[in-house]
Each structure stands twice: as structure tokens, then as C-alpha cells.
């Protein structure tokens, strides 16, 4: 199978033998469907089943972290008994679960443009006609996206309704003052952190989350970009009231949320945030002892988040050193 994005067929020897059959083999075997008919958009999911001892219910994958959804890179380790092989989890109705998952992924793909354009329109409208409500509006958009990932509607109009209602409710805090706005921004970060810790699907299968065709879990580039606003605004607002340690706390929270291996797993977003925080602190404080201590504390928190979270996009890039990390970011 040729991957046009990665430049065609991979180099090296074939690791697996592939056979075609008109009937399901008795096993052990991995049975899967593959795309046929020339070039196709990478937006369809194909069936796969592992016929062997210990596999019941739906398949699980460390590559996707979504039960029932696996990546093509999982096939070879499973067939060869290597690290990174597929697992499984019990399910009374695996076919129904897979149908629901596929429908949910399709619904999110269809709703993504609607939710994004409506979100931007609401933020621009609030910034134009009610500037005091811009930060609450941002919070409303991000919290609505998280709520939609948790409740999993399959109709775009429900997504739009939840988004509008959440932003409208958030505008009630427009006149609440900078401290409340700062706490609201920090609360958005905490909500995403907790959501990814409880059930990664709440973010992964949200309208603004990953598309499940190249990136499966954590934060999408779009969502990571929107999540730049809460940490930067929250850190500055709480710093003005509570001092440098409030700034450091919000910065640490955001870096763990965005870059932590068990959470956002977005190395590029974490680097952007880190640079932004350092620039903000340097402009306000200059390069003094407090900045050095705060920066060291943030670095320690981020390192712990990467170390204890297992393998992710970020740790895989870091394993190849600075050159590999630069290639991944580029």
C-alpha cells in the first residue's frame, strides 16, 4: 500500500506475508480490509480483526488510545509478537460499539468547520461590540468543545446550539473583573487536564480535536492554538494580583496540559507556550533570580509530565534528539 503523504512505498524488506482469501481463516491471523481503486482521501476507516488467543471484544492500541480504533503501524508488532502489539477489551456488543465510534468520528469531521467558523464569528462579534467579554467568550468556546466531546452528539445543529448557549452563559462573567477572568482562564486549562486524565476521548473526539486519520489523541494543532489564549491571559491577570508564583503556577499547568505525554502530547504547542512565558516574564522582570527559579520550576514540572506519561508523540520525537525533534516540528 502506497502512502502518498510520506513519499510512496517504505524502504527495506517486507516484514509480513499478506494473503487474500474469500473466506475468514481459522486463525491465528490478522484479517483486515485495505483501500483499493487508486488514490483516495485519508478519511475512511477499514475493518480489522485479530483471530487469536486473548483477543475478545474490541481492539485497543497505544497508538490511538481510543478503544476500537487502531493504526496501521500496529499490525506488524501484533503479527510478530513485538512491543507495541494490539490488545483488546471486553465488550458485549463490539460491532455496535464500532459502528457508534465510526459514526461519531464522521459526525465530528462534518461538524468541525461549523463549530470553528461559528466560534470565530462569536469571538469577533464579542470583541467588536462587547470587548469586556472577549476572555469569557474564549472560555465558553473551549468549554463548549469539551462538553461536546463528552456528550458526543451526532448532529451539527446540536453542536452549534451548545456552543452559542455556553458562550452566552460565559458572558455573564464579562464584568467580573481581572481576577475572576484569570481564574476562569486557569479553570479552562484545569478542565482540559482533568478531562484528558479521566477519558482521553472527551478531547480526542471533540469537534475541534484530532481528526483520527494521522493524529488520534491529545490536542490537534487547531485546539492547541486556541488554548494559547487561556494560559497567557490567565498567567498575566493572576500575576498582577498574586505575584510571580501565580504566573509560574498557570505556566506549569498549561505546559503539563499541552505537552504532557498523558494529556495534550503536543510538543510544538508546549515549545510555543514556553517561549511566550519566558518572553513575558523577561519583559516584566528582566533576567533576575525570580525568573530563573520560576523557569527552573516550570522545566521540572514539564519534565516530570513527560517522564511519567509513557510513550507519546512528544517522547517519540525526543528519543531522536534535537535533530529528530526539529524534523518533527518542521
Task: Give the predicted meaning of each segment.
Residues 67, 91-93, 113-116, 202-203, ...:
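Hydrophobic alpha-helical transmembrane segments
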Residues 99-211, 224-236:
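Core alpha-helical transmembrane segments of integral membrane proteins
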Residues 1-105:
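Soluble extramembrane regions of membrane proteins in the secretory/endomembrane system
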Residues 43, 70, 74, 142, ...:
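Generic recognition of stable, solvent-exposed alpha-helical segments in well-folded globular domains
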Amino acid at each position: 500500500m502506497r502512502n502518498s503523504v510520506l513519499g510512496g512505498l517504505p524502504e527495506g524488506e517486507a516484514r509480513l506475508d499478506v494473503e487474500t482469501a474469500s473466506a475468514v481463516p481459522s486463525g491465528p491471523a490478522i484479517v483486515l480490509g485495505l483501500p483499493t481503486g487508486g488514490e483516495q482521501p485519508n478519511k475512511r476507516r477499514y475493518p480489522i480483526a485479530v483471530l487469536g488467543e486473548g483477543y475478545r471484544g474490541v481492539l485497543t492500541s497505544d497508538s490511538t488510545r481510543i478503544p476500537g480504533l487502531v493504526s496501521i503501524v500496529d499490525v506488524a508488532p501484533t503479527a510478530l509478537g513485538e512491543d507495541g502489539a494490539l490488545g483488546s477489551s471486553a465488550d458485549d456488543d463490539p460491532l455496535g460499539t464500532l459502528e457508534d465510534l465510526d459514526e461519531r468520528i464522521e459526525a465530528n469531521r462534518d461538524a468541525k468547520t461549523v463549530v470553528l467558523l461559528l466560534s470565530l464569528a462569536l469571538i469577533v462579534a464579542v470583541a467588536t461590540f462587547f470587548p469586556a467579554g472577549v476572555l469569557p467568550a474564549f472560555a465558553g468556546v473551549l468549554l463548549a468543545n469539551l462538553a461536546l466531546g463528552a456528550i458526543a452528539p451526532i448532529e451539527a445543529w446540536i453542536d452549534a446550539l451548545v456552543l452559542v448557549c455556553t458562550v452566552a452563559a460565559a458572558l455573564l462573567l464579562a464584568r467580573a473583573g481581572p481576577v475572576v477572568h484569570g481564574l476562569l482562564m486557569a479553570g479552562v486549562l484545569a478542565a482540559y487536564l482533568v478531562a484528558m486524565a479521566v477519558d482521553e476521548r472527551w478531547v480526542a473526539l471533540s469537534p475541534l480535536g484530532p481528526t483520527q486519520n494521522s493524529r488520534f489523541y491529545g490536542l490537534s494543532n487547531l485546539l492547541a492554538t486556541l488554548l494559547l489564549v487561556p494560559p497567557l491571559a490567565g498567567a498575566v491577570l493572576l500575576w498582577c494580583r498574586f505575584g510571580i508564583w501565580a504566573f509560574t503556577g498557570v505556566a506549569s499547568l498549561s505546559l503539563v496540559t499541552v505537552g504532557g505525554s498523558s494529556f495534550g502530547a503536543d510538543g510544538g504547542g508546549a515549545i510555543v507556550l514556553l517561549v511566550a512565558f519566558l518572553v513575558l516574564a523577561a519583559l516584566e522582570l528582566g533576567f533576575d533570580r525570580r525568573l530563573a527559579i520560576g523557569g527552573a520550576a516550570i522545566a521540572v514540572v514539564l519534565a516530570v509530565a513527560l517522564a511519567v506519561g509513557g510513550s507519546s508523540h512528544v517522547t517519540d520525537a525526543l528519543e531522536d534528539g534535537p535533530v529528530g525533534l526539529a524534523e518533527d516540528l518542521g
